Amino acid sequence: MTKTIFITGASRGFGRIWAEAFLQRGDNVVAAVRQPETLKELAKEFPVNLFVLQLDVTDKKASFEAIEAAKARFGGIDVLINNAGYGQIGAVEELSEQDVRSQFETNVLGSLWTIQAALPLMRAQKSGHIIQLSSALGLNTVTLMGLYSATKFAIEGMTETLAAEVSDFGIKVSLVEPGRYDTDFSGSHSLARSESISVYDNMRKVFWDYADQEDSGKPAATVNALFALVDSQEPPLRLILGKTAYPWVKNTYEQRLKTWEAWQDVSVAAHG
């Protein structure tokens, strides 16, 4: 059965790969992007099934208008994939107020606006699936990525709550949590850099040396995972992507449990 998939940030990276994959299997795709000209050739290849919309996800009014335009074009939306976002590299001490506001406005509020816009339509349909791109960094952190992790931790909490709130309406909700992938995430469009303080220069060098050596996943390899998620009658709330992310996250939770257990007496005594 043909599905209508609304994808934000569909001009590059995961968003572009997933948009092309859904089109190739015959689905309808609404590609919401900041620069529609980036999808000009793809629009020529799929003139019927692809609907390209200009959208800055930080614009709440525009997000609601985009959902309405998608409904007018295809009659409804089966799946909303909130993929738009970017990273910010910088130690916590280095972050400016503008760094923080911009990151949260795009990564958190940008997702919130499209979710709020899509929910009335999905409730009326009594069906729908909201897929929120998070990250393994929404479950753990690394140095210099504290702000990005903060937005993803926020996304994790908001999306898990959303899943509980809308399940009675027939709406499914999933978080997709990729590890490191060979996308353009570290490029100028997807990774901003804060003003640097010299005491963190060595930490920066270690960060980039490790990033260059890490076994990055291939973005195209995620396509079947997205198909399985979208087509599942009972999709998981969380789906980790990549062989490096799973053991890292598993170890994180094991260490947290050990710490909580070691301090359990103190925790219980604090109840009063």
Residue ranges, per PLM feature:
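Conserved glycine-rich cofactor-binding loop
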Residues: 11-12
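The beta1-alpha1 cofactor-binding region of Rossmann-like NAD(H)/NADP(H)-dependent oxidoreductases
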Residues: 55-65, 97
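A glycine-rich helix->loop->beta "capping" turn
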Residues: 69-82, 88
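Substrate-binding pocket helix/loop in short-chain dehydrogenase/reductase
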Residues: 91-92, 99-101
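Active-site helix of classical SDR
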Residues: 115, 151
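Residue(s) in the substrate-gating loop at a strand-loop-helix junction
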Residues: 135
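SDR active-site lid
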Residues: 168-236
